[in-house]
């Protein structure tokens, strides 16, 4: 019986063959998601707007936002999630702090905003969009010398850059913020994870320390670990002197 002669491929030929096979396979897109935990959010007033005060009376300039992505439940099936749909929850530190205080919490309103992604997968620009979200608000009663306040967050056009390398760690959106009779509109950029860049001067006062945003550790300077921020974003991250958080100086091209 004759045997078929098989010529062994050279290592170079094997590599060429492997590349040819892999290039013919489409990589699946990641699911729409958001970094789990806090985002450092910078609020920029839109043209023609007047700044509104934050809860403590200072101009609102930014804060930490909690974002969470989940699959809603299927209709009529309380214990089964629907993988064909995805939703996003946003909770500001301001309303979160109020909601966890038993003396201040407003049971009549939700402290978080909720909206649905347009799709469970990013679009052709690797962007996941949540066009509209429910309003988040809390009413704080007057207590002692403190006046009553009503704070409201209305989010729209929230977009996250989602790729294998950047799994929902950069976001932008529009915010309409109300504090009592003051309402203002802001453009928002957010970066995950939220990292404080608050250092101290010789008198113990909080000051901006840009080194705390560096993703590379520097044990000699007392930084045993890096910031945890993606090193690829280093050129677009800075310590904001107003909110003392490491923030995006510019969103990625996909979110502009």
Please identify what each model-predicted range represents:
Residues 56-171, 177-179:
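Predominantly extracellular/secreted and cell-surface proteins with exposed
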Residues 192-198, 230, 249-254:
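N-terminal targeting sequences that direct proteins away from the cytosol to non-cytosolic compartments
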Residues 21-24:
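C-terminal motif of bacterial Sec signal peptides marking the signal peptidase cleavage site
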Residues 1-13:
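Bacterial N-terminal signal peptides that target proteins for export
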Residues 163, 238, 243-250, 255-256:
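Long, compositionally biased low-complexity segments
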Residues 179-220:
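A contiguous, mid-protein "functional segment" used to position or interact
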Residues 37-41, 169-175, 184-188:
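One face of beta-strands
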Residues 26-74, 81-85, 204-214, 219-231, ...:
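Tryptophan-anchored aromatic micro-motifs
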